[in-house]
């Protein structure tokens, strides 16, 4: 088994020495460095946790065209792709440096250097500025560490790092759902969210809308996903993952009120949007990369898997009071029980049926729009019942079935 030696870096500070498998890109051996406090939070509990963090860092092979790219380029695994791109990311400041290399963070940072994304199959029209190109582009790509299953890519638009997202399937609903979530948060007056804009995709078999947003990490701020926050400290078996996350956040400088307020608002708005995929990689915190203190909760992002986006979840095919989710609890109603302040969402400021219909009208291939909108209205009624009564409405409660006319 051939091995290669690297140093795990945080900007220009050595974090650990690594031996990587030359073929698979997996971590074989870890030798801690002199700065253990710089270890990635999700890989700070020993060598095995760092191996898992590295594996999670690699782009999922299920994402978009990644499997085809690996086959085309003869790359054996997503971890190998990560190694070829020095483990670089547009979410944080970790990277790997080959032993003996004189590379510095200034040389490789994707926040300040140009890059070319290998996934050229998804292009956009540029109403908000032109994507830059460079004849002197380094070989490093942020695609190797880009998370999630949907096809997506990083672009540089007017010197700003932007993420372009596509859809699963033949219509634009998931991307337009991101735009809808932005609309909802803006109407609520909630500033800490990612602002998604709709963009026309070109070069695909069927013309669709994607969505684009600016990177919320930077040269000074790192995104730490909730899974890494949770994994950074051993959890007592008597403590829920939800409370453990809050505890770790407060230990790193955030106030308990700030964290709870954010999580409860997110739970309530995810409920009305029927966002079923708020797993621990889909929210987190922003960290000051110099002090390592948490600065604030990361803005709400990734709400595409909402609004009954998959047909089996259409309201007439599922119980709107017991929709299962990938989150802190197994169902939406169980998540609502975590909310202590029901006033965090203003019912009168939620988007109306006509506003959503106008947004979905951008793509006439979106099916079941009337059913989706009826489901949304049902969820508003359920949420209003929760706001008034303090308990989730139960199946059979007459007012939870038909929206007001």
What are these regions (language model features)?
Residues 1-268, 272, 286-405:
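Phosphate/dinucleotide-binding and metal-coordinating scaffold of catalytic cores
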Residues 279, 284-286:
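Conserved protein-kinase catalytic-loop segment immediately C-terminal to the catalytic Asp
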Residues 275-276:
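Glycine-rich phosphate-binding P-loop
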């Amino acid at each position: 088994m051939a091995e290669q030696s690297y140093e795990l870096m945080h900007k220009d500070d050595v974090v650990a020495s690594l031996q990587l498998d030359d073929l698979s890109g997996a971590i074989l051996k870890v030798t801690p460095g002199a700065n253990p406090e710089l270890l990635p939070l999700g890989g700070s509990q020993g060598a095995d946790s760092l191996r898992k963090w590295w594996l999670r860092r690699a782009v999922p092979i299920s994402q978009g065209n990644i499997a085809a790219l690996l086959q085309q380029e003869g790359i054996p695994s997503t971890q190998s792709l990560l190694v070829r791109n020095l483990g670089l990311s547009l979410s944080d400041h970790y990277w790997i440096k080959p032993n003996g290399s004189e590379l510095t963070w200034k040389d490789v940072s994707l926040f300040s250097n140009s890059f070319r994304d290998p996934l050229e199959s998804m292009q956009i029209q540029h109403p908000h500025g032109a994507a830059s190109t460079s004849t002197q582009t380094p070989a490093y790509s942020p695609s190797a560490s880009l998370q999630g299953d949907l096809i997506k890519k990083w672009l540089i638009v007017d010197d700003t790092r932007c993420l372009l997202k596509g859809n699963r399937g033949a219509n634009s609903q998931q991307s337009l759902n991101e735009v809808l979530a932005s609309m909802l948060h803006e109407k609520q007056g909630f500033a800490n969210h990612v602002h998604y804009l709709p963009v026309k995709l070109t070069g695909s078999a069927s013309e669709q809308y994607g969505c684009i947003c600016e990177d919320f990490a930077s040269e000074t701020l790192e995104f730490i996903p909730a899974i890494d926050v949770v994994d950074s400290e051993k959890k007592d078996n008597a403590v829920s993952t939800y409370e453990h996350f809050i505890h770790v956040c407060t230990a790193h400088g955030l106030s308990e009120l700030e964290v709870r307020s954010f999580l409860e608002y997110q739970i309530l708005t995810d409920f009305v949007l029927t966002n079923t995929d708020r797993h621990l990689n889909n929210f987190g915190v922003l960290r000051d990369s110099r002090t390592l203190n948490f600065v604030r909760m990361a803005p709400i992002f990734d709400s595409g898997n909402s609004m009954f986006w998959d047909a089996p979840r259409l309201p007439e095919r599922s119980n709107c009071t017991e929709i299962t989710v990938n989150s802190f609890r197994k169902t939406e109603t169980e998540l609502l029980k975590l909310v202590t302040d029901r006033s965090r969402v203003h019912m009168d400021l939620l988007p109306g049926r006509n506003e959503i219909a106008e947004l979905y009208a951008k793509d006439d291939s979106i099916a079941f729009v009337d059913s989706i909108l009826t489901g949304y209205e049902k969820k508003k009624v359920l949420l209003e019942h929760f706001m008034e009564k303090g308990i989730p409405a139960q199946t059979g409660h007459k007012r939870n079935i038909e929206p007001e006319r």
